Amino acid sequence: IPEEHLLGRRSEEKTRQLLLDCKRANFNVIRVWGGGFYPDEWFYDICDELGLAVWQDFMFACSVYELTEAFETNIRQEFIDNIKRLRHHPSLALWCGNNEMEMFVDERCWVTKHTEVRDYLLMYERIIPEILKDHDHQTFYWPASPSSGGSFDEPNDPARGDVHYWKVWHGNRPFPEYRKFFFRYLSEFGFQSFPCKKTIDTFTDDPADWNIFSYVMEKHQIGRASCRERV
């Protein structure tokens, strides 16, 4: 996920420190999430230098797309441009088609017509593999995250492929719930924390606003009261 939502505030120095922190914490893989953007060249140079492998999503996430002729022409060129730009990096471990779209299309979330299911398969199981065959046949391709290998074959199966498990956060389940599973590869899970006091000071004037139940704190909580209660 981008280290800054205001991309102009990003810097090579800040990103290097974050990646160095990852290495020191014994991370070995960095995932570039499909809901963000393709990083600059120096991001991959730093990963090369530090020995961090990169899981690279293509920039598609949490949606469905209508594969019109104009859109297909556009994304084909986007794929080719970024594949050619990044394929030489030793840190590039795999290409991934999208974030969470196979799972949700399989569940018919966001889907309003059958052609969107067809277009999903065309984009991630035909077009991208064909382009990779021509321009980077050596790098592994994974159709989605999570996935069990594609074609809507139980894409969030805990025993195959990779899994996104958010039932502790979104489902209000207790932390010991994690101990019930032995995921083959858990590529997403987590729980929100509150920001540090230094950050809170930037958007509060009255100490009364520091209360987590205050109006100001609730408005800065993306999930409003329900997420505040979980934390």
Where would I find each of the regions flagged by the language model?
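Active-site-adjacent substrate/metal-binding segments within catalytic domains
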Residues: I1-S63, E69-L94, K219-R230
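Short, solvent-exposed loop/turn and secondary-structure capping segments
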Residues: R9, W42-F43, D106-R108, C196-K198
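Short, charged/polar micro-motifs that form catalytic or ligand-binding hotspots
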Residues: W33, R118, P176
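Active-site-proximal loop/turn and secondary-structure-junction residues that shape catalytic pockets
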Residues: G36-Y38, F60-C62, M101, S147, ...
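Active-site flanking residues adjacent to catalytic metal/cofactor-binding acidic residues
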Residues: Q56, N99, S187
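Substrate-binding clefts and catalytic carboxylate motifs of secreted carbohydrate-active enzymes
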Residues: W95, E130-K133, S145, G149-N156, ...
